[in-house]
Swiss-Prot record:
It comes from Aquifex aeolicus (strain VF5). Residues 122-313 form the ATP-grasp domain. Its cofactor is Mg(2+); Mn(2+). InterPro entries: ATP-grasp, CbamoylP_synth_lsu-like_ATP-bd, CbamoylP_synth_lsu_CPSase_dom, MGS-like_dom, MGS-like_dom_sf, MGS_CPS_CarB, PreATP-grasp_dom_sf. This is Carbamoyl phosphate synthase large chain, C-terminal section.
Length: 537
């Protein structure tokens, strides 16, 4: 009988934990079978591929809770258990399983604990000489207000006991913080609230890497197209980064290597960073598969979950991927990924899919709480075209002419100017409500004023309904009431008008429209290639 290994899946799908983890579990099963192991899958979701009867050698359809998992282990007597592919759910079982004599394959439970525990992790960051945004933990309302004042607004607040960014909020002033503490969470000694300095106007990055404890291979450095503060699962992302310098990307890769070695990671690691004024800050480290693993694997042509599984059962990266190390040692690696050759000039853009149409009352706005339920991908040699393809796949057909409606929060007004002028050059009519209109007019943009919903009719929502507005850029003001902005966004969803709620997404749209217009002027259309062709381009 072959050696047995148990893989724990991610349990039921929910917003924040979806099918991406199932992808990693299935690849882990295939990898074990390639190495001659008997793969035992434990999961409880009928919607997944890992629970197909012919995927693993044996399937247990059981909840991912300690008692059930322990019963299976006692019955199967495996060599060990792999936890790192099921997201956060199985990770919580690491210490209880180890205490009961179960061998955890891959990253040790102590290392998982060090990455998950805020105090231990802060000590590690200081020890490695890295930077982290200032933060604090509050157990009373008074303590929360005191910490927020010391750190300085805006702050990111969240309960310490939730996953998937639920109940997280960016708070811009004391009044808003009081409201959040009264309405959204109950702060107490048992349920503390975590408060972090929110790095306004920063760029967020995600890194997926594989480590064997000595060597670390960077799968990809991904740049979020939305600003920091939008949940990583809701942001469009680009491989390689499209607006960061090579030096920053190399620094991020180096910091990821340090963290993976210090945490003695054996398998996958995901690190999230924010870059503000050319300074790199570590936001969080997950010593497990992240939801970007399928996207990265398809972008680089290497199955990260398969590689990580081979590492978890004791193989070294140099054994598994000699050709990648050869390329690295010759200095021939792509700047944002150790796996890709230097000449690989391809952009992959991931865009997310939202269920807004199924929930007519939900405000379709992005924030630290995850709301997306799927994702698509666009690949091309230019960032603009890759982004255009991703929008098309997500169901947004970007207009090449027509009218653009702009309404932004005061803090975004200086950034809107260049964007409005560029759209004007492309032949778009610019419409705006009073505040934004006044600002644009004063700075030489030929904008037209349109009424807010509260100012009477015909207003901006009427224009959207009548098909007179073809694109909307509307950033939130920080307040959550059902404002004019809410009705604008809902009308866009209802009438299929592409709308964007962050400035960086607005600039990415501009880049996409410029690229597609240029392509058409040259008499060409979008090129379509299979992934197999792309790896050989």
């Amino acid at each position: 009988m072959s050696k047995k290994v148990v893989i724990l899946g991610s349990g039921p799908n929910r917003i924040g934990q979806g099918i991406e983890f199932d992808y990693a579990c299935v690849h882990a099963v295939f990898s074990l079978q390639e190495e001659g192991y008997y793969a035992v899958m434990v999961n409880c979701n009928p919607e997944t591929v890992s629970t197909d009867y012919d995927t693993a050698d044996k399937l247990y359809f059981e909840p991912i809770v300690f008692e059930h998992v322990m019963d299976i282990i006692e019955r199967e007597k495996p060599e060990g258990v792999i936890l790192q592919f099921g997201g956060q759910t199985p990770l919580k079982l690491a210490l209880p399983l180890q205490k009961n004599g179960v061998k955890i394959l891959g990253t040790k439970p102590e290392s998982i604990d060090k990455a998950e525990d805020r105090e231990l992790f802060r000590e590690l960051i200081i020890e490695l000489g890295l930077k982290q945004p200032p933060s604090g933990t509050a157990r009373t309302k008074e303590e929360a207000l005191k910490i927020a004042k010391e750190i300085g607004f805006p702050v990111l607040v969240r309960p310490s006991y939730v996953l998937g960014g639920r109940a997280m909020r960016i708070v811009y002033d004391e009044e808003e913080l009081k409201e959040y503490l009264e309405e959204a969470v109950s702060v107490s000694h048992e349920r503390p609230v975590l408060i972090d300095k929110f790095l306004d106007n920063s760029i967020e990055l995600d890194v997926d890497a594989v480590s064997d404890g000595k060597d670390v291979l960077i799968g990809a450095v991904m740049e979020h197209i939305e600003e920091a503060g939008v949940h990583s699962g809701d942001s469009a992302t680009s491989i390689p980064p499209y607006s960061l310098s090579k030096e920053i990307v190399e620094e991020v890769k180096e910091q990821t290597r340090k963290l993976a070695v210090a945490l003695e990671v054996k398998g996958l690691i995901n690190v999230q960073y924010a870059v503000q004024n050319n300074e790199v800050y570590v936001l969080e480290v997950n010593p497990r598969a992240s939801r970007t693993v399928p996207f990265v694997s398809k972008s680089i042509g290497y199955p990260l979950a398969k590689i990580a599984t081979k590492v978890a059962i004791g193989k070294s990266l140099r054994e598994i991927l000699p050709e990648v190390f050869e390329r690295l040692e010759k200095g021939e690696a792509h700047f944002a990924s150790d796996f890709l050759p230097k000449e690989k000039k391809i952009f992959s853009v991931k865009e997310v899919v939202f269920p807004w149409k199924r929930f007519p009352e939900v405000d379709p706005i992005l924030g630290p709480e995850m709301k997306s339920t799927g994702e698509v991908m666009g690949i091309d040699k230019e960032f603009g075209l890759a982004y255009y393809k991703a929008q098309l796949s997500a169901g947004y057909r970007l207009p090449e002419k027509g009218n653009l409606f702009i309404s932004v929060a005061d803090r975004d007004k200086p950034k809107i100017l260049e964007l409005a002028k560029e759209f004007e050059k492309l032949g778009f009519g610019i419409y705006a409500t009073s505040g934004t209109y006044k600002f644009l007019k004063e700075h030489g943009v030929n904008a037209k004023r349109v009424l807010k919903v509260s100012e009477g009719r015909p207003n901006v929502v009427d224009m959207i309904i009548n098909g007179e507005i073809h694109l909307v850029i509307n950033t939130p003001s920080g307040k959550r009431e059902k404002s004019d902005a809410y009705y604008i966004r809902r009308a866009c969803v209802q009438f299929n008008v592409p709308y964007y709620t962050t400035m960086r997404a607005g600039y990415a749209v501009l880049e996409a429209i410029k690229s597609i217009k240029k392509l058409k002027e040259e008499g060409k259309g979008l090129s379509v290639h299979s992934l197999q062709e792309i790896y050989n381009i």
